Every structure is written in C-alpha cells, then in structure tokens.
Amino acid sequence: MRLDRFTSKFQIAISDAQSLALGRDHQYIEPVHLMVALLDQNGSPIRPLLTILNVDVTHLRSKLSEMLDRLPKVSGIGGDVQLSSAMGAMFNLCDKIAQKRQDAYISSEIFLLAAIEDRGPLGQLFKELGLTEQKVSQAIEQIRGGQKVNDQNAEELRQALEKFTIDLTERAEQGKLDPVIGRDDEIRRTIQVLQRRTKNNPVIIGEPGVGKTAIVEGLAQRIINNEVPEGLRGRRVLSLDMGALVAGAKYRGEFEERLKSVLNELSKEEGNIILFIDELHTMVGAGKGEGSMDAGNMLKPALARGELHCVGATTLDEYRQYIEKDPALERRFQKVLVDEPTVEDTIAILRGLKERYELHHHVEITDPAIVAAASLSHRYVSDRQLPDKAIDLIDEAASSIRMQIDSKPEALDKLERKIIQLKIEQQALSNEHDEASEKRLRSLNEELNEKEREFAELEEIWNAEKAALSGTQHIKAALEQARMDMEFARRAGDLSRMSELQYGRIPELEKQLDLATQAEMQEMTLLKNKVTDNEIAEVLSKQTGIPVSKMLEAEKEKLLRMEEVLHKRVIGQKEAVEVVANAIRRSRAGLSDPNKPIGSFLFLGPTGVGKTELCKTLANFMFDSEDAMVRIDMSEFMEKHSVARLVGAPPGYVGYEEGGYLTEAVRRKPYSVILLDEVEKAHPDVFNILLQVLDDGRLTDGQGRTVDFRNTVVIMTSNLGSSRIQENFAMLDYQGIKEQVMEVVTKHFRPEFLNRVDETVVFHPLSQDHIKSIAAIQLNRLANRMEEHGYQLEVSDKALELIAQVGFDPVYGARPLKRAIQQSIENPLAKSILAGSVLPDKKIQLIVNNDQIVAHQ
C-alpha cells in the first residue's frame, strides 16, 4: 500500500512504530506498536478522541505496554523489521473505511476505528474498555467538525482556534488579567464599532505603552461580568498568536492553510468570537512569498462582509507605514485613537494595579510611591509613554526591596567577610611561636569573639524581621483568592457561597492583615518592606542618571559650599563661579523652570583665563568625572552643511541611521554639562538650532525623535571682545567692561539668540597673584603624578614666585604658565630621573639658584 495515502501525522507515527519495534527486538511491526506510537505522538488526535470517549489514557497506555512485553523477541536480525500480516490487514481496513467516508487521505483516527473492528488482541482490549464503532464514529465527527480529510496536513489544521489563539475571556474568568482602570471612552467606542452590521472591526491606535492591549483585556473582563450590551453578551475574545501561526510553516502554502482553517472555524462560530490581533501590522506581508497571498489580503473578504469580528492594535508609526499603504485594508477598519493618560489618570491606574504588584513582590507599595512614580516618570522619562513607564518604576522599586529581603543585608554580609578574613589570619598566626605573633594572636582572638557576637546578634534580628515580614504574605494571598472565589460565585449565581465569603471569610482575613501589618510597623533595623517615594527616585536616578532622590545632609552641605569647591581650580573668576553655582542650586532645590535647561551661559573673555576649565570643574563637581561633559568644538561646524552633524543627517543622506553628534550624546546622558567651545567660529545657522534648546529645552533629531535638554547645563565659550577687555581692564569696573564687550557681541550674534541665554558672563584677565595661585595648583598636580612613581616633590616659595613671573603674560592668560613649568621644571626633572641623579626614596626640593629653578635632593 502506498505511504502517500496516509496523512503526514500518520506517516510519522508509522516511522515511530518501526523504531519502537526495532528498539524492543521485535521482528514484526504489530498494530499495538502503531497504537503506542499514536498515543505518544505530540499533537496526535488520538488522545483528545479517547478523552471525549471517557477512556483512561494512562490505564490504556499501561495495558498496551503489557501487550508489547508479551510479544516474542528475536536477536541478531540486523535491524530488519517488517509489517506483520495483522498490520497489513489493518491498513487495508483503514483504506476501506476512508473510502467509505469519502476521505482523500487516511488519518490517524481511522486507525482507531479499524482497531475496534479488528478481531486481534488490540480489538479485544478496546471492547473491554467499552468502545464501539458507533461511539468512536460520533467522537470522530465531533473532532473533525464535519470536515473531510482532503489534505495531508488535515490533522494539524483541526481545532485551529485552540492551537493558534489565546482565550482572553477564559483568562479573565480565572483572574489572570490585570484590572483595567479608566479607559471607559475607548472601551465604549470599541464596543460601538463591534455592534455595527458591516465593517465592525475597530483598530486601536496609540503610542507604545499607552495601554492598547489593556483596552481589549478590559473588554474581555466586561464580557465576563455582563457589563456589555445584549449583542456582545456571551462572546469570547480570542487573541491570535502570530508566532504559533508562522512557526513551523516550512512549505509554501502551509501558513495560508493554517490561517484559512482559523477563518473557517471563526465563520462556523457565527459571530460569537471576537478575534484580537495584537501588532496588526504583522499581518501585512506575513506569509508573502513569490506568487502567494499575504495574511492581510486573506482577511479582507471576511472583514468586509462582517463575518469576522476583529479588533486590531498597532502603533501610529506602524499603522501609517503598513496599514495606510493598503487603502482596501484600511477602509475595513475603524480607528479608535488612544492618547497617553494624564498624570492623574496614571495615578488611578497604578492604584488599581497596586495589589497585584504587592502580591507578586510580597512588599507594600505606599501611596506617595505611586504619586512619585507617575509625576517623576512624566517629567524625567521623555522618550516613553505613561502608564507604562510609571508601572516600570513601581515594578523595579518593589523588585529591589524584595531582593534585599531575600538576600543578606549589606551590614551582615560585610561582617561575615570580615570574620572570614580574621579566621584566615588566626590560622596563619597559630603556627608562629615568636612573642610578637603570640601577642597579635591574643588581640585577634578578642576581636574575632567580638565580631562573632555582633554577627550572631545581627543574624538573629535579621531572621526575626524576615519572619515578621513573611507573616502578611500568606494572609494577602488568601485574601486575593477569597476575592476571586467571591467573583466566581457571583457569576455562577451561588448566593450562599457569595455571602459566606463577603460577610465571613473576607472581613476575617482583612482583620488578620491589619493586625499583622501593625506588628510589622515596628521599627526595622535591617530590612524594609515598603516601597516609598525615595525608592522610586533611586530607581529613576539609576535609569536616567538624573539626581531626583532626596538630598542627604552631605549633599546639601556640598551644594552650599559649591563656590568654595569651584574656586580651588578656577582662580579669579568670582562672578562666573557664582552664576553657575546658583543655577545648579536652583535645579537641585526644584525651583528651576521645568521646561528649560538647568542653565544656559555664554562665557566671554580672553584666551587662557579659565572658561573651559570652569566647565571641566563643574562636570567634576556634579558627576565626579570630567568625562561626563559633552564637549563640542564649534570650529568643526564652520560650513553650512556641517550643521546636520549636530542633529543627524536627513532621510536619504549617508549617515541617516547614525543620529546626531549632539542629540545622541544627550539621549545617552540626559543629565550632563554641554560645552560648545569657541562658539563664534561656528556657522550662523548653528545658532538657529540652538534657539529651540535654549528656550524649550528640546531638540528634534534627523529621525524625528524629540531629545530632552531640560536636565543639561549648556555653556558656550567665546573670545569675542577680548581685545576690549585687555584695553579697558585697568580703567573700568566689571559692569563697564561687560558693556564694552556686549557691544562687540551684539554685532556678531543675533538678538533672538542672546535673549535666550540665561547669563552672559565676562571673565577677567588674570593678574600676577592669580597666576601664582594657578602655578601652585599646576605644581601640586605634578607632585601627584610624581608620587605615583615613588618620588616626593617639594616646591619652595621662591621657586613658586619665579615660575609665576616667568609664566605671566596678561594677553595669553594661564597657558604660558604651563609651558614655563614644562621647560623650567618638568624637562630637567625628566633628565635627572632617567640619569639616576634623583632617587625615589628621598624628597626632591625645587629651589632657586642664580635665577634658575634647580632640583635638589
């Protein structure tokens, strides 16, 4: 008999039966081998068929194993197995039954029907189990749904809805869906479209993270609770699993067959099913090959006739890119636009979800934490949408607290490591017998005993606190289950069970929870089980790098003494340092304008007076690293076309995918100092781009993304008017010099640019005393570099004064000083070190001899 007369599943089962016979040293493939192979096969229709017939599959499997054990074994046959005569007869009978049923192919369930008619041991076993030809035929009709077997893959396409969809109404019944708060208008509009006679297919469109899928889940929950119009009551909402539909479709036409079987089953349900297609744009082009039809085109006829009640969900960009390009598909859907919820709506949504997250993480989420998550994420996370970004903050903050409870607290962990370290030292000293070692051992033993006692006390506290925290978790879980049971009872109309739960079990559990929570309220030493606004702020700071957590006393003190810290590196520029320090303090105190950068400054002054140095010092103060500064040399942007490098090339140009130099840097580090050095050398068009940054704290890059500059300090430096400063420094005060410089600046920059800068600061030329202070800083850095190599450097006052005189130049500022230090100190020292005339252990003194600085050791 030809194997290609069997369905593909049946062919695989025959191969499995052959392997089974071979493995058990049987010479012939008997019907029992094939029956075992069909039972064990993944996705075979035999198991569901036997379940319909109320047959205990486990009992049947053990009986078949006994039959296999009784078959004769033959050794040394070289792996040659053949079909037995009983098997051949069974196949002939299968062929006969298939022809009677007008099937083009022989499917697996036909073998079960043939086995019942068989007079062999397999037929006898089925008769004992009470199976008759009539019963099996009825069950086969039920599984097939009135379909003939006209395709080799017919078995795979059966029960397509169970295989390729997820039942959202069933999940809602089981309480597996999160509650949907608000969104009443959108759900009502969706129901309104579903009630139409034709084109009753809403497509929910919105930005990622605004809650499109949640609207469909809300619809499923309303259907379960009978809170929908009469026309939608009793409907099922099924979510199409595109992954399952495409996975394993190896040959052309297989994907289309699967989709067609889903559509056929949906049409049989006669409008009782609402099909939800998440990421609707994936249907356009899915399964598209040369000469084949894609999924979108296969859906069109069913959508137009109103046979298929479909709800789609996709983002605005993907709707424009895929759906709008196909007007025939677009007109079959009705748009339901979903906007981002407000901060107030988000707080309501988070309050509704709070219990689910508390139950999952076994921690308590306070109301200030919910308010902080909504407001802080709205202000500081600009590239994502509410409520998704706020839920993420709550989830991660709760996760971090749970992690601290489950793992050892930091204090306990440090103490344990210290004890291990002391024990290693104790072991090493116990082998030594000199007086010093014995003395050290005695003090070590005392220290070790003290640490172990401290560790034992802390561990006891930790275990007690852990036990106290876990007490409420069981009560919360039981309370959640009781509420779910009450909901089931309400739907089933079981009033006695409902009242028993509502007035007995639930109030009792709530009372227990109150008592347990009060016990937990006692002050914890090591652990905490509450998510507060502090934890939310910490998580946000880690995600974005923006410091939004409450300031510790040390940080407040540091900010109040900010000028003092900056003056240690920036000498003689009092006004500039004050202006910058005030801007940072305003920002950290929360008083700065939330729609503008923290501060925008234009630093003017001659070369070498500390304009760039102040930016570096500020970055170091704020981030403990000068690398946190985004430095852009504006002399690179002298040509008109180079402006595109800041925000990224426009579409169609090379480098479009790479993004802009400025925008990408700020997207990666939203909290940073941006230094636009030598700004007057840039092309005038660059300033048109900066207007938006300085005014609204935002900039749109080449790919249309909005980049947030509200947490940056923008500093621009320029040498404009430096000649006026040099000429009038001795004669005019600071205000007079500033007016002189601004005359030059207003001729170069446009008024709308200068008007948007917060402060224009004029830097003073440096005096002899300033240069001396800078020389001390520079020589201190040199001493630190030498210390790394084991040399100690000491500078005499006379040497310091001499180097300040040599390096002083009122025109070029502090830069000549660097050159003077290199020539007079660093070069001779390098020669001395290489020659070996100075030694690492002894102190090197820089002294003046005959107006020359010499190294003396």
Curated annotation (Swiss-Prot):
One of its GO terms (biological process) is protein refolding. Residues 555-765 are annotated as: NBD2. Residues 766-857 are annotated as: C-terminal. Residues 159-340 are annotated as: NBD1. Residues 3-146 form the Clp R domain. Gene3D superfamilies: 1.10.8.60, Clp, N-terminal domain, P-loop containing nucleotide triphosphate hydrolases. It is found in: Cytoplasm. InterPro entries: AAA+_ATPase, ATPase_AAA_core, Chaperonin_ClpB, Clp_ATPase_C, Clp_N_dom_sf, Clp_R_dom, ClpA/B, ClpA/B_CS1. ATP 2 binds at residues 605-612. Belongs to the ClpA/ClpB family. This is Chaperone protein ClpB. The lineage of its organism: Bacteria, Pseudomonadati, Pseudomonadota, Gammaproteobacteria, Vibrionales.
